[in-house]
Amino acid sequence: NKALPFVTDEKLKEDVRGFIKQEAMHARGHSSATEEYLAARGIKTERNQKLMKWLFDVVLDDKPFGKKMPALLERRWLLARLGLVATIEHMTCVLGMYALENKKWDEINADQVMLDLIRWHGAEEVEHRSVAFDLYKHLGGDYLSRYYLAAIVVPMIIGLWVDGAANIAGQDPRFANKKPAVYKPWMWVEWFKASRKQLLPNPLWLVLQQLPYFSPWYDPAKEGSTELAQAYLDQSPAAMAAGAIAANMKVAA
């Protein structure tokens, strides 16, 4: 939203608006379906949610840690945050493609509602994979800054994912004695084990998939498959429900 007033390309501006709407819909979908699913199994997510809220509402706020940014640095701070989002969008595009192409989940009869929610989200991540990157470049983001931002963001995000998973695993009575934590080898070993069963992407594979983003010639349009994403969205119950809600909201407005 903060970047919209600086966008001079109308198509990009429309893409950014669509991106914002999609992310808002994802947030609502996850907060309702995922929380209900986990709550029914005695899993609490408040700690993970508070961490994310602190990260985005305090650390990455217009006024980080409540401190007003000097006027000369405001544009650079905006670009830095856009670069961060662009990096994350590449990572989620990779995971989106993994979710769309993983057949093992179907073979083991994974919960169909949750599976659809994950693939719907993944398909839309693939679909809008270029928006944040294009916006970053449009507003003057350079390669060197993108490179160093990605070098920080990639391990940070992977660490946050593992930390969140550890918090959830720690609430499972089966793993109580393990005391899961991001800094403990057990969590990473379990991730590798799950990846060998094709239940999760291999950690090393996931890291290698980030390497194209570090290239000066990186082009998000060449990553992922819009056709595969759109094909899933066309038949996804979650996507159709979200579309109906959006249409009703538009009519009501």
Predicted regions and their residues:
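Non-heme di-metal
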Residues: N1-A253
